[in-house]
C-alpha cells in the first residue's frame, strides 16, 4: 500500500513540475 502512495506522490510531483514549466513558457511552443 505504501508503494502505491509513494508512486502517486512521485507522479503528482512530476506532473506539477511539467505543468509549471509548460505554462511558464507558452510562447516558445506556440511560435513554432
Swiss-Prot record:
Topological type in the membrane: Single-pass membrane protein
Name of the protein this chain belongs to: Photosystem II reaction center protein T
Domain of life: Eukaryota
Function: Found at the monomer-monomer interface of the photosystem II (PS II) dimer, plays a role in assembly and dimerization of PSII. PSII is a light-driven water plastoquinone oxidoreductase, using light energy to abstract electrons from H(2)O, generating a proton gradient subsequently used for ATP formation.
HAMAP family: PSII_PsbT
Chain's gene name: psbT
GO terms classed as biological process: photosynthesis
Localisation: Plastid, Chloroplast thylakoid membrane
Family the UniProt entry places it in: Belongs to the PsbT family.
Subunit architecture: PSII is composed of 1 copy each of membrane proteins PsbA, PsbB, PsbC, PsbD, PsbE, PsbF, PsbH, PsbI, PsbJ, PsbK, PsbL, PsbM, PsbT, PsbX, PsbY, PsbZ, Psb30/Ycf12, at least 3 peripheral proteins of the oxygen-evolving complex and a large number of cofactors. It forms dimeric complexes.
GO CC terms in record: chloroplast thylakoid membrane; photosystem II reaction center
Keywords: Chloroplast, Membrane, Photosynthesis, Photosystem II, Plastid, Thylakoid, Transmembrane, Transmembrane helix
SS bond list: none
Transmembrane regions listed in the UniProt entry: 3-23
